[in-house]
Amino acid sequence: MTNSLLTIGDMVQGVELPDADRQFWWDSLAPILSRMLQCSKYSVESQANILSFFKDFIVPSYGPRPSIGGEFFWKSYVTYNHTPGQVSFNFHKDKCTVRLSNVPTAPLAGTASDPFNQKGVVQTIKQIQKALPDMDITLFDYFSEAFLVADEDTVGLDARKPVPQYNQLVVASMLGYDFEPVPRVKVYFNPRWKALQMNTENHDLIWTAINNLGSPIKSYKRTLDLLQECGTPRQLGGWIFQPEFISFDLAENMSNAARLKLYGFTTKTCWSHIESIYTLDGRLNDAETQRGLAVLKRLWHLALSIPEDHDENQDLPPCPHLTAGVIYNYELRENSAKPEAKIYIPVRFYGSGDGKVIEGLVDFFKSEGWDELARSYQRDFVSVFSTPDGKMAGEHHDISFSYKNEHPYVTAYYRPELIRPMERHIV
Protein backbone atom coordinates (compact mmCIF):
# COMPACT_ATOMS: atom_id res chain seq x y z
CA MET A 1 0.00 0.00 0.00
CA THR A 2 1.05 3.56 -0.52
CA ASN A 3 0.07 7.04 0.52
CA SER A 4 0.89 8.80 -2.76
CA LEU A 5 -2.73 9.67 -3.56
CA LEU A 6 -4.18 11.53 -6.51
CA THR A 7 -6.54 14.31 -5.54
CA ILE A 8 -10.11 13.12 -5.20
CA GLY A 9 -11.15 15.62 -7.85
CA ASP A 10 -9.18 13.63 -10.40
CA MET A 11 -11.62 10.75 -10.12
CA VAL A 12 -14.91 11.54 -8.40
CA GLN A 13 -15.70 15.23 -7.91
CA GLY A 14 -18.10 16.91 -10.29
CA VAL A 15 -19.82 13.68 -11.34
CA GLU A 16 -23.51 14.39 -11.84
CA LEU A 17 -25.93 11.47 -11.61
CA PRO A 18 -29.53 11.43 -12.87
CA ASP A 19 -31.34 11.40 -9.52
CA ALA A 20 -30.85 12.43 -5.90
CA ASP A 21 -30.61 8.84 -4.63
CA ARG A 22 -27.70 7.88 -6.84
CA GLN A 23 -26.03 11.23 -6.23
CA PHE A 24 -26.14 10.65 -2.47
CA TRP A 25 -24.57 7.18 -2.66
CA TRP A 26 -21.91 8.36 -5.10
CA ASP A 27 -21.00 11.39 -3.00
CA SER A 28 -20.86 9.23 0.14
CA LEU A 29 -18.90 6.25 -1.16
CA ALA A 30 -17.00 7.09 -4.34
CA PRO A 31 -14.35 9.23 -2.56
CA ILE A 32 -13.64 6.39 -0.12
CA LEU A 33 -13.48 3.77 -2.88
CA SER A 34 -11.24 6.00 -4.98
CA ARG A 35 -8.77 6.52 -2.15
CA MET A 36 -8.73 2.79 -1.41
CA LEU A 37 -7.88 2.00 -5.03
CA GLN A 38 -5.09 4.56 -5.02
CA CYS A 39 -3.64 3.26 -1.76
CA SER A 40 -3.64 -0.25 -3.21
CA LYS A 41 -1.61 0.78 -6.26
CA TYR A 42 -4.25 0.12 -8.90
CA SER A 43 -3.29 1.66 -12.21
CA VAL A 44 -5.04 4.89 -13.18
CA GLU A 45 -6.83 3.02 -15.97
CA SER A 46 -8.04 0.34 -13.55
CA GLN A 47 -9.22 2.97 -11.08
CA ALA A 48 -11.22 4.73 -13.78
CA ASN A 49 -12.78 1.47 -15.00
CA ILE A 50 -13.71 0.34 -11.48
CA LEU A 51 -15.23 3.71 -10.57
CA SER A 52 -17.20 3.68 -13.82
CA PHE A 53 -18.52 0.19 -13.01
CA PHE A 54 -19.34 1.35 -9.49
CA LYS A 55 -21.24 4.38 -10.81
CA ASP A 56 -23.21 2.52 -13.47
CA PHE A 57 -24.06 -0.76 -11.73
CA ILE A 58 -23.41 -0.69 -7.98
CA VAL A 59 -24.55 2.80 -7.00
CA PRO A 60 -28.09 2.28 -8.39
CA SER A 61 -28.40 -0.93 -6.38
CA TYR A 62 -28.20 0.91 -3.04
CA GLY A 63 -31.72 2.14 -3.71
CA PRO A 64 -33.39 5.09 -1.99
CA ARG A 65 -31.15 7.33 0.10
CA PRO A 66 -31.63 7.73 3.87
CA SER A 67 -34.04 10.32 5.21
CA ILE A 68 -32.85 13.78 6.19
CA GLY A 69 -32.73 12.50 9.76
CA GLY A 70 -30.44 9.65 8.71
CA GLU A 71 -32.95 6.78 8.85
CA PHE A 72 -32.24 4.10 6.28
CA PHE A 73 -34.93 3.23 3.76
CA TRP A 74 -34.36 -0.51 4.26
CA LYS A 75 -32.75 -1.55 7.52
CA SER A 76 -30.56 -4.64 7.58
CA TYR A 77 -27.88 -5.83 9.94
CA VAL A 78 -25.10 -6.24 7.41
CA THR A 79 -23.45 -3.67 9.70
CA TYR A 80 -24.28 -2.92 13.31
CA ASN A 81 -26.14 0.33 12.54
CA HIS A 82 -27.87 -0.72 9.26
CA THR A 83 -25.38 0.93 6.88
CA PRO A 84 -26.18 -1.21 3.80
CA GLY A 85 -22.67 -2.27 2.88
CA GLN A 86 -18.97 -2.44 3.67
CA VAL A 87 -15.67 -1.77 1.95
CA SER A 88 -12.56 -3.83 2.60
CA PHE A 89 -8.87 -4.39 1.97
CA ASN A 90 -7.74 -7.98 1.40
CA PHE A 91 -4.07 -8.58 2.26
CA HIS A 92 -1.99 -11.50 1.05
CA LYS A 93 1.76 -11.08 1.39
CA ASP A 94 2.54 -7.90 -0.54
CA LYS A 95 -0.71 -7.82 -2.54
CA CYS A 96 -3.72 -5.73 -1.59
CA THR A 97 -7.14 -6.12 -3.24
CA VAL A 98 -10.05 -3.75 -2.76
CA ARG A 99 -13.46 -5.28 -2.15
CA LEU A 100 -16.97 -3.97 -1.60
CA SER A 101 -20.29 -5.49 -0.58
CA ASN A 102 -23.82 -4.14 -0.33
CA VAL A 103 -27.46 -5.07 0.07
CA PRO A 104 -29.24 -4.32 -3.24
CA THR A 105 -32.47 -2.53 -2.42
CA ALA A 106 -35.33 -2.02 -4.84
CA PRO A 107 -37.57 1.07 -4.53
CA LEU A 108 -40.55 -1.11 -3.55
CA ALA A 109 -38.70 -2.98 -0.78
CA GLY A 110 -40.89 -3.26 2.29
CA THR A 111 -44.13 -2.91 0.34
CA ALA A 112 -46.59 -5.66 -0.59
CA SER A 113 -44.78 -5.95 -3.93
CA ASP A 114 -41.43 -6.78 -2.29
CA PRO A 115 -41.92 -7.22 1.47
CA PHE A 116 -38.53 -8.89 2.14
CA ASN A 117 -36.33 -6.92 -0.29
CA GLN A 118 -35.77 -9.81 -2.71
CA LYS A 119 -36.12 -8.02 -6.04
CA GLY A 120 -33.08 -5.76 -5.73
CA VAL A 121 -30.54 -8.55 -6.20
CA VAL A 122 -32.33 -9.94 -9.27
CA GLN A 123 -32.54 -6.51 -10.90
CA THR A 124 -28.88 -5.76 -10.16
CA ILE A 125 -27.58 -9.04 -11.60
CA LYS A 126 -29.56 -8.41 -14.80
CA GLN A 127 -27.93 -5.00 -15.13
CA ILE A 128 -24.42 -6.29 -14.40
CA GLN A 129 -24.78 -8.87 -17.16
CA LYS A 130 -24.71 -5.97 -19.61
CA ALA A 131 -21.18 -5.10 -18.48
CA LEU A 132 -19.99 -8.68 -17.90
CA PRO A 133 -21.71 -10.74 -20.63
CA ASP A 134 -19.48 -13.77 -20.00
CA MET A 135 -20.59 -14.00 -16.37
CA ASP A 136 -22.24 -17.38 -15.83
CA ILE A 137 -25.44 -16.94 -13.79
CA THR A 138 -26.44 -20.61 -13.74
CA LEU A 139 -25.87 -20.86 -9.99
CA PHE A 140 -27.65 -17.57 -9.39
CA ASP A 141 -30.75 -18.74 -11.25
CA TYR A 142 -30.73 -22.05 -9.40
CA PHE A 143 -30.29 -20.68 -5.89
CA SER A 144 -32.63 -17.71 -6.36
CA GLU A 145 -35.32 -20.21 -7.34
CA ALA A 146 -34.48 -22.36 -4.31
CA PHE A 147 -34.10 -19.58 -1.74
CA LEU A 148 -36.28 -16.59 -2.68
CA VAL A 149 -39.97 -16.60 -1.81
CA ALA A 150 -42.27 -16.42 -4.83
CA ASP A 151 -44.48 -13.33 -4.98
CA GLU A 152 -47.66 -15.30 -4.43
CA ASP A 153 -46.20 -16.94 -1.31
CA THR A 154 -45.20 -13.73 0.47
CA VAL A 155 -48.78 -12.90 1.47
CA GLY A 156 -49.19 -13.31 5.22
CA LEU A 157 -45.62 -14.53 5.74
CA ASP A 158 -44.50 -11.40 7.57
CA ALA A 159 -47.06 -12.10 10.28
CA ARG A 160 -45.36 -15.44 10.97
CA LYS A 161 -41.92 -14.02 11.70
CA PRO A 162 -40.59 -15.36 15.02
CA VAL A 163 -39.21 -12.03 16.34
CA PRO A 164 -40.11 -8.40 15.54
CA GLN A 165 -36.60 -7.65 14.20
CA TYR A 166 -36.70 -10.53 11.71
CA ASN A 167 -36.76 -8.21 8.68
CA GLN A 168 -33.52 -6.58 9.81
CA LEU A 169 -31.82 -9.78 10.99
CA VAL A 170 -32.50 -11.75 7.81
CA VAL A 171 -30.47 -10.22 4.99
CA ALA A 172 -32.15 -12.20 2.22
CA SER A 173 -29.45 -11.39 -0.32
CA MET A 174 -26.26 -9.40 -0.72
CA LEU A 175 -23.68 -8.86 -3.45
CA GLY A 176 -19.91 -8.65 -3.12
CA TYR A 177 -17.32 -7.38 -5.58
CA ASP A 178 -13.62 -8.21 -5.74
CA PHE A 179 -11.79 -5.68 -7.91
CA GLU A 180 -8.96 -7.79 -9.37
CA PRO A 181 -9.08 -5.31 -11.23
CA VAL A 182 -11.94 -6.67 -13.38
CA PRO A 183 -14.91 -7.00 -11.00
CA ARG A 184 -15.60 -10.52 -9.74
CA VAL A 185 -19.15 -10.80 -8.46
CA LYS A 186 -20.20 -12.85 -5.44
CA VAL A 187 -23.79 -13.57 -4.39
CA TYR A 188 -24.98 -14.21 -0.82
CA PHE A 189 -28.31 -15.83 0.04
CA ASN A 190 -29.91 -16.27 3.46
CA PRO A 191 -33.05 -18.37 2.84
CA ARG A 192 -34.74 -17.95 6.23
CA TRP A 193 -37.88 -16.43 4.73
CA LYS A 194 -38.14 -19.37 2.34
CA ALA A 195 -37.56 -21.82 5.21
CA LEU A 196 -40.30 -20.08 7.19
CA GLN A 197 -42.66 -20.34 4.24
CA MET A 198 -41.88 -24.05 3.80
CA ASN A 199 -42.00 -24.84 7.54
CA THR A 200 -38.50 -26.30 7.47
CA GLU A 201 -35.18 -25.60 9.15
CA ASN A 202 -32.95 -23.07 7.41
CA HIS A 203 -29.90 -25.37 7.38
CA ASP A 204 -31.95 -28.27 6.01
CA LEU A 205 -33.13 -26.09 3.14
CA ILE A 206 -29.54 -25.10 2.35
CA TRP A 207 -28.27 -28.69 2.38
CA THR A 208 -31.17 -29.88 0.22
CA ALA A 209 -30.57 -27.18 -2.38
CA ILE A 210 -26.85 -27.94 -2.54
CA ASN A 211 -27.29 -31.70 -2.74
CA ASN A 212 -29.90 -31.30 -5.49
CA LEU A 213 -27.50 -29.37 -7.71
CA GLY A 214 -26.55 -32.64 -9.36
CA SER A 215 -23.45 -32.95 -11.51
CA PRO A 216 -22.01 -29.46 -10.77
CA ILE A 217 -21.60 -30.43 -7.12
CA LYS A 218 -19.95 -33.84 -7.60
CA SER A 219 -16.42 -32.42 -7.48
CA TYR A 220 -17.19 -30.96 -4.04
CA LYS A 221 -18.52 -34.23 -2.61
CA ARG A 222 -15.69 -35.08 -0.21
CA THR A 223 -15.79 -31.67 1.41
CA LEU A 224 -19.57 -31.58 1.53
CA ASP A 225 -19.74 -34.99 3.16
CA LEU A 226 -17.28 -33.84 5.81
CA LEU A 227 -19.24 -30.67 6.57
CA GLN A 228 -22.55 -32.51 6.72
CA GLU A 229 -20.97 -34.96 9.14
CA CYS A 230 -20.34 -31.94 11.38
CA GLY A 231 -24.09 -31.57 11.86
CA THR A 232 -23.73 -34.26 14.53
CA PRO A 233 -21.58 -33.48 17.60
CA ARG A 234 -18.58 -35.70 18.33
CA GLN A 235 -19.43 -35.62 22.02
CA LEU A 236 -22.44 -34.60 24.10
CA GLY A 237 -22.86 -30.84 23.92
CA GLY A 238 -20.03 -30.50 21.42
CA TRP A 239 -19.74 -28.14 18.48
CA ILE A 240 -21.94 -28.69 15.43
CA PHE A 241 -22.13 -26.91 12.09
CA GLN A 242 -25.48 -25.81 10.69
CA PRO A 243 -25.13 -23.39 7.76
CA GLU A 244 -26.87 -20.05 8.15
CA PHE A 245 -26.32 -18.70 4.62
CA ILE A 246 -24.25 -19.33 1.50
CA SER A 247 -22.25 -17.41 -1.07
CA PHE A 248 -20.86 -18.28 -4.48
CA ASP A 249 -18.93 -16.65 -7.30
CA LEU A 250 -20.46 -15.81 -10.63
CA ALA A 251 -17.44 -16.98 -12.59
CA GLU A 252 -17.11 -16.79 -16.35
CA ASN A 253 -17.51 -20.55 -16.49
CA MET A 254 -19.31 -22.32 -13.67
CA SER A 255 -17.29 -25.48 -14.20
CA ASN A 256 -14.12 -23.43 -13.81
CA ALA A 257 -14.11 -23.12 -10.03
CA ALA A 258 -17.09 -21.11 -8.87
CA ARG A 259 -16.22 -21.05 -5.19
CA LEU A 260 -19.01 -22.05 -2.85
CA LYS A 261 -18.96 -20.91 0.78
CA LEU A 262 -21.14 -22.03 3.68
CA TYR A 263 -21.46 -19.63 6.61
CA GLY A 264 -22.08 -20.25 10.28
CA PHE A 265 -22.60 -18.00 13.28
CA THR A 266 -21.93 -18.43 16.99
CA THR A 267 -22.39 -16.31 20.08
CA LYS A 268 -19.64 -18.25 21.84
CA THR A 269 -16.48 -16.16 21.79
CA CYS A 270 -13.98 -18.20 23.81
CA TRP A 271 -10.83 -19.29 21.97
CA SER A 272 -11.50 -23.00 22.53
CA HIS A 273 -14.75 -22.67 20.56
CA ILE A 274 -13.02 -20.76 17.74
CA GLU A 275 -10.47 -23.58 17.60
CA SER A 276 -13.28 -26.12 17.24
CA ILE A 277 -14.75 -24.12 14.36
CA TYR A 278 -11.41 -23.84 12.58
CA THR A 279 -10.54 -27.54 12.93
CA LEU A 280 -14.08 -28.94 12.54
CA ASP A 281 -13.89 -30.01 16.17
CA GLY A 282 -10.61 -31.82 15.61
CA ARG A 283 -11.55 -33.48 12.34
CA LEU A 284 -8.86 -31.42 10.62
CA ASN A 285 -5.50 -31.98 12.32
CA ASP A 286 -3.04 -31.87 9.43
CA ALA A 287 0.12 -29.80 9.69
CA GLU A 288 -1.14 -26.90 7.57
CA THR A 289 -4.32 -26.60 9.63
CA GLN A 290 -2.28 -26.49 12.83
CA ARG A 291 0.05 -23.83 11.42
CA GLY A 292 -2.92 -21.74 10.33
CA LEU A 293 -4.52 -22.15 13.74
CA ALA A 294 -1.41 -20.81 15.46
CA VAL A 295 -1.35 -17.74 13.20
CA LEU A 296 -5.08 -17.18 13.69
CA LYS A 297 -4.65 -17.30 17.46
CA ARG A 298 -1.99 -14.60 17.28
CA LEU A 299 -4.23 -12.37 15.15
CA TRP A 300 -7.26 -13.05 17.38
CA HIS A 301 -5.37 -11.85 20.44
CA LEU A 302 -3.80 -8.84 18.72
CA ALA A 303 -6.93 -7.58 16.94
CA LEU A 304 -9.09 -7.88 20.06
CA SER A 305 -6.39 -6.77 22.54
CA ILE A 306 -6.76 -10.00 24.51
CA PRO A 307 -4.09 -10.67 27.16
CA GLU A 308 -2.00 -13.77 26.50
CA ASP A 309 -3.06 -15.28 29.83
CA HIS A 310 -6.79 -15.01 29.05
CA ASP A 311 -8.63 -18.27 29.86
CA GLU A 312 -9.19 -20.06 26.53
CA ASN A 313 -12.52 -21.42 27.77
CA GLN A 314 -13.87 -18.04 28.85
CA ASP A 315 -16.01 -15.94 26.52
CA LEU A 316 -15.08 -12.35 25.79
CA PRO A 317 -16.91 -9.66 27.79
CA PRO A 318 -20.51 -9.65 26.53
CA CYS A 319 -21.72 -7.19 23.90
CA PRO A 320 -25.42 -6.22 24.07
CA HIS A 321 -25.89 -5.74 20.32
CA LEU A 322 -28.50 -8.03 18.80
CA THR A 323 -26.07 -9.41 16.20
CA ALA A 324 -22.94 -9.69 18.35
CA GLY A 325 -21.05 -12.92 17.79
CA VAL A 326 -18.64 -14.56 15.37
CA ILE A 327 -19.34 -15.29 11.70
CA TYR A 328 -17.28 -17.95 9.97
CA ASN A 329 -17.34 -19.81 6.68
CA TYR A 330 -16.02 -22.86 4.92
CA GLU A 331 -14.90 -22.47 1.33
CA LEU A 332 -15.37 -25.41 -1.02
CA ARG A 333 -13.14 -25.83 -4.03
CA GLU A 334 -13.33 -28.46 -6.72
CA ASN A 335 -11.72 -31.80 -5.83
CA SER A 336 -10.39 -30.50 -2.52
CA ALA A 337 -10.18 -32.97 0.37
CA LYS A 338 -11.04 -30.39 3.01
CA PRO A 339 -12.78 -27.04 3.31
CA GLU A 340 -10.87 -23.81 3.91
CA ALA A 341 -12.04 -22.18 7.13
CA LYS A 342 -12.36 -18.43 7.50
CA ILE A 343 -13.00 -16.68 10.81
CA TYR A 344 -14.41 -13.15 11.03
CA ILE A 345 -12.96 -11.49 14.11
CA PRO A 346 -15.71 -9.11 15.37
CA VAL A 347 -13.57 -6.12 16.33
CA ARG A 348 -16.52 -3.67 16.31
CA PHE A 349 -18.38 -5.70 18.92
CA TYR A 350 -15.52 -6.97 21.07
CA GLY A 351 -12.49 -4.83 20.22
CA SER A 352 -11.14 -1.74 21.95
CA GLY A 353 -11.65 0.84 19.20
CA ASP A 354 -9.93 1.64 15.92
CA GLY A 355 -6.68 2.76 17.54
CA LYS A 356 -6.16 -0.59 19.26
CA VAL A 357 -7.29 -2.54 16.19
CA ILE A 358 -4.76 -0.69 14.05
CA GLU A 359 -2.05 -1.30 16.64
CA GLY A 360 -2.88 -5.01 16.70
CA LEU A 361 -2.91 -5.30 12.92
CA VAL A 362 0.42 -3.51 12.60
CA ASP A 363 1.97 -5.89 15.14
CA PHE A 364 0.53 -8.83 13.22
CA PHE A 365 1.86 -7.54 9.90
CA LYS A 366 5.31 -7.17 11.46
CA SER A 367 5.18 -10.73 12.80
CA GLU A 368 4.43 -11.99 9.27
CA GLY A 369 7.24 -9.99 7.71
CA TRP A 370 4.82 -7.71 5.85
CA ASP A 371 7.03 -4.73 6.61
CA GLU A 372 5.75 -2.28 4.01
CA LEU A 373 2.16 -2.91 5.09
CA ALA A 374 3.12 -2.52 8.76
CA ARG A 375 4.64 0.88 7.98
CA SER A 376 1.77 2.16 5.85
CA TYR A 377 -1.42 0.72 7.34
CA GLN A 378 -2.26 3.40 9.90
CA ARG A 379 -1.31 6.18 7.52
CA ASP A 380 -3.43 4.71 4.74
CA PHE A 381 -6.42 4.12 7.01
CA VAL A 382 -6.37 7.80 7.96
CA SER A 383 -5.87 8.84 4.32
CA VAL A 384 -8.84 6.78 3.14
CA PHE A 385 -11.34 7.67 5.85
CA SER A 386 -10.43 11.17 7.03
CA THR A 387 -12.66 14.06 5.95
CA PRO A 388 -11.69 17.69 5.24
CA ASP A 389 -13.00 18.72 8.67
CA GLY A 390 -10.74 16.23 10.42
CA LYS A 391 -13.36 13.60 11.25
CA MET A 392 -13.23 9.91 10.34
CA ALA A 393 -15.65 8.52 7.74
CA GLY A 394 -15.15 4.86 8.51
CA GLU A 395 -14.36 2.31 11.20
CA HIS A 396 -13.19 -1.29 11.45
CA HIS A 397 -16.09 -3.73 11.60
CA ASP A 398 -14.48 -7.18 11.24
CA ILE A 399 -11.10 -8.72 10.45
CA SER A 400 -11.23 -12.04 8.62
CA PHE A 401 -8.54 -14.72 8.51
CA SER A 402 -7.92 -17.78 6.37
CA TYR A 403 -4.77 -19.77 5.67
CA LYS A 404 -3.87 -21.57 2.46
CA ASN A 405 -0.74 -22.50 0.60
CA GLU A 406 1.24 -21.81 3.78
CA HIS A 407 0.23 -18.14 3.91
CA PRO A 408 -2.44 -16.14 5.75
CA TYR A 409 -5.12 -14.15 3.97
CA VAL A 410 -6.36 -11.23 6.05
CA THR A 411 -9.22 -8.90 5.16
CA ALA A 412 -10.09 -5.70 7.03
CA TYR A 413 -13.77 -4.78 6.68
CA TYR A 414 -14.87 -1.21 7.28
CA ARG A 415 -18.23 0.43 7.85
CA PRO A 416 -18.25 3.66 5.84
CA GLU A 417 -19.75 6.73 7.47
CA LEU A 418 -22.22 8.32 5.06
CA ILE A 419 -22.27 12.05 4.41
CA ARG A 420 -25.00 14.39 5.61
CA PRO A 421 -27.49 15.05 2.81
CA MET A 422 -26.78 18.24 0.91
CA GLU A 423 -29.10 20.42 -1.15
CA ARG A 424 -28.68 18.33 -4.28
CA HIS A 425 -29.75 15.20 -2.37
CA ILE A 426 -33.09 16.75 -1.40
CA VAL A 427 -35.90 16.75 -3.93
From Swiss-Prot:
Keyword Coiled coil: no
Family annotation (InterPro entries): Aro_prenylTrfase (IPR033964), Aro_prenylTrfase_DMATS (IPR017795), DMATS-type_fun (IPR012148)
Annotated binding of L-tryptophan, by residue: Y77, V78
Pathway: Secondary metabolite biosynthesis
One GO term of the biological process aspect: alkaloid metabolic process
Keywords for this protein: Transferase
Superkingdom classification of source: Eukaryota
GO molecular function annotations of the record: transferase activity, transferring alkyl or aryl (other than methyl) groups
EC number: 2.5.1.-
Binding, substrate: R99, K186, Y188, R259, K261, Y263, Y344, Y409, Y413
General function of this protein: Indole diterpene prenyltransferase; part of the gene cluster that mediates the biosynthesis of the indole diterpenes penitrems. The geranylgeranyl diphosphate (GGPP) synthase ptmG catalyzes the first step in penitrem biosynthesis via conversion of farnesyl pyrophosphate and isopentyl pyrophosphate into geranylgeranyl pyrophosphate (GGPP). Condensation of indole-3-glycerol phosphate with GGPP by the prenyl transferase ptmC then forms 3-geranylgeranylindole (3-GGI).
Family: Belongs to the tryptophan dimethylallyltransferase family.
The protein, known as: Indole diterpene prenyltransferase ptmD
Naturally occurring in which organism (per UniProt): Penicillium ochrochloron
